[in-house]
């Protein structure tokens, strides 16, 4: 598969923003260990958004193919459902030259308060990940990273969310 460069990703993010802003989350699935599929409804259509953190084919895109889902949803999927189901997509954004796409959802928590949950799709080869963040703190990550795995950046529930360190080489657009 072709490596996803920042320019292509920026175009994809813009298209997703145009298509999906204000769409409501209907369902969430985790068909494979590294992929999340979110079904979103606009007034006129239903879309399936694929977020893949698979090392060889990390990407975000709309998908047509229906996938087999495990009978018992994995714990990350259950958590995503708890925090995102019924939420509205308010924005899809990314920093120029970066490889992280931020999906901002307006959701209602258990107390009935409106909260903003951001799903961060970090699309960086074998370090790709999906991280759910609220108020700057990590709710959870698809691939948790503890101190043993990295002394530079940990991804664990409750820790502040920081973006990955920038690569040394410039990313020419």
Could you tell me what each predicted segment is?
Residues 44-173:
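Phosphate/anion-contacting hairpin/loop surfaces
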Residues 4-68, 72:
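A structured, charge-rich N-terminal accessory region that forms the first stable segment of a protein
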